[in-house]
């Protein structure tokens, strides 16, 4: 199995290793988009150059990374991020900073509860902050696509890889 930065299997496998409990995956499926949305709203207030926001710059960078991992889903993620940016630019989102911060905070609280209560382990961001933050929305998109029946072989491969990692971890603990 490839372990490179641009290896889809290893990137999704890294994330799945920390997110395999169904209740925690459900929590993440709700609150990763909440964090992405509210964080994007807050970062849209930060202008990098004239009217170009930090959200726009990060969206482009995320989209490029996602496309390099796997073009079809990368394009889908890019379109979703573009739509979010267009909504922000066109002032279709009418939240105060306090509301955005509240959603952002609630999202993170639920993330940590999910890990502590259901996974019973620390979150992935403790081991790799940037990888976790960048991959979280993409992983959730894959989880949604898997639920719809797309890419069954990739889903099975990731589940098989997870079983091997968990078995190795149990053997190390003995």
Curated annotation (Swiss-Prot):
Keyword entries, A-Z? Dioxygenase, Endoplasmic reticulum, Iron, Membrane, Oxidoreductase, Transmembrane, Transmembrane helix
| Primary site of residence | endoplasmic reticulum
Q: Which InterPro entries match?
A: Mpo1-like
Which residues face the membrane's Cytoplasmic side?
Answer: 1-23, 85-98, 153-174
Q: Enumerate the GO terms in the molecular function aspect.
A: fatty acid alpha-dioxygenase activity
Membrane-protein topology: Multi-pass membrane protein
Show which residues sit on the Lumenal side of the membrane: 45-63, 120-131
Q: Where in the cell is it found?
A: Endoplasmic reticulum membrane
Q: Name one GO cellular component term.
A: endoplasmic reticulum membrane
Superkingdom, taxonomy of origin: Eukaryota
**Reaction catalysed?**
(R)-2-hydroxyhexadecanoate + O2 = pentadecanoate + CO2 + H2O
Q: Membrane-spanning regions, if any?
A: 24-44, 64-84, 99-119, 132-152
Task: Tell me its family.
Answer: Belongs to the MPO1 family.
Q: What is this protein called?
A: 2-hydroxy-palmitic acid dioxygenase MPO1
């Amino acid at each position: 199995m490839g372990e490179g930065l641009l290896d889809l299997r290893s990137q999704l496998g890294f994330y799945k290793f920390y997110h395999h409990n169904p209740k925690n995956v459900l929590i993440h499926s709700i609150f990763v988009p909440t964090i992405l949305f509210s964080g994007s709203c807050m970062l849209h207030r930060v202008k990098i150059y004239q009217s170009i926001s930090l959200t726009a710059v990060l969206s482009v960078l995320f989209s490029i990374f996602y496309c390099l991992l796997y073009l079809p889903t990368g394009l889908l993620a890019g379109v979703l991020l573009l739509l979010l940016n267009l909504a922000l630019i066109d002032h279709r989102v009418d939240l105060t900073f306090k509301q955005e911060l509240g959603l952002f905070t609630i999202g993170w609280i639920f993330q940590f509860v999910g890990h502590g209560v259901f996974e019973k382990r620390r979150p992935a961001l403790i081991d790799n902050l940037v990888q976790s933050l960048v991959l979280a929305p993409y992983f959730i998109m894959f989880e949604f696509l898997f639920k719809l029946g797309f890419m069954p072989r990739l889903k099975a491969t990731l589940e098989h890889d997870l079983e091997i990692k968990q078995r190795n971890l149990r053997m190390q603990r003995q």
